[in-house]
Swiss-Prot record:
Keywords: ATP synthesis, CF(0), Hydrogen ion transport, Ion transport, Membrane, Mitochondrion, Mitochondrion inner membrane, Transmembrane, Transmembrane helix, Transport. SUPFAM superfamilies: F1F0 ATP synthase subunit A. This is ATP synthase F(0) complex subunit a. NCBIfam families: ATP_synt_6_or_A (TIGR01131). GO terms for cellular component: mitochondrial inner membrane; proton-transporting ATP synthase complex. Gene3D superfamilies: ATP synthase, F0 complex, subunit A (1.20.120.220). Belongs to the ATPase A chain family. It holds the Pfam family ATP-synt_A. Its main location: mitochondrion.
């Protein structure tokens, strides 16, 4: 019997209980807190990447926005490491679950919106009505801007889910095609396998890029509200 194409996206269970919580906690092991005075190469590389990313993320923020630095860095490290671990064979990628991505996107989006209404109430309300709007269009524009505001967390979650899921499905299909072609034509199977390797390299880049894009959009939402 052929394996279900979406079997790899099913939440794994142990004795009937989902173990996704353990899987989500696993990436934290990859970033240990060093106890030595002199860091090794891996820790130094991690610190350099964090400093480089934090400079790019926080350059546009004022002092109030920079208080979110730890949250943003933790977010990009968590999503990036989770996406990369999901590329390992026979592994599970939590970021292919829309429910989990919504669980990250909605609280972060709500936090930025609440921050804006608490500290910049007039400016936040002004976003619902662009300056110079004709009076007859005011009700319609308010409704449109309200809908666009509430669509933001959904767009965050769907973008991450769709990109990660599409890559995994494509790798699954090309890998299955390479195995099927081995009995038909070895040369075509080798070409297909080469395409699979190139796609895998591309998926490594996509995993990191999607983590950066997700965090960058949260950072931009925060910038608009601080």
């Amino acid at each position: 019997m052929n394996e279900n194409l979406f079997a790899s996206f099913t939440t794994p269970t142990m004795m009937g209980l989902p173990i996704v919580i353990l899987i989500i906690m696993f990436p934290s092991i990859l970033f240990p807190s060093p106890n030595r005075l002199i860091n090794n190469r891996l820790v130094s590389l991690q610190q350099w990447l964090v400093q480089l990313t934090s400079k790019q993320m926080l350059a546009i923020h004022n002092h109030k926005g920079q208080t979110w630095a730890l949250m943003l860095m933790s977010l990009i490290l968590f999503i990036g490491s989770t996406n990369l671990l999901g590329l390992l064979p026979h592994s599970f990628t939590p970021t292919t679950q829309l429910s989990m991505n919504l669980g990250m996107a909605i609280p972060l989006w709500a936090g930025t919106v609440i921050t804006g209404f608490r500290h910049k109430t007039k400016a936040s309300l002004a976003h619902f009505l662009p300056q110079g709007t004709p009076v007859p269009l005011i009700p319609m524009l308010v409704v449109i801007e309200t809908i666009s505001l509430f669509i933001q967390p959904m767009a965050l979650a769907v973008r991450l889910t769709a990109n990660i899921t599409a890559g995994h499905l494509l790798m699954h299909l090309i890998g299955g095609a390479a195995l099927a072609l081995m009995n038909i034509s070895t040369s075509i199977a080798l070409i297909t396998f080469t395409i699979l390797i190139l796609l895998t390299i591309l998926e490594f880049a996509v995993a990191l890029i999607q983590a950066y894009v997700f965090t960058l959009l949260v950072s931009l939402y925060l910038h608009d509200n601080t």
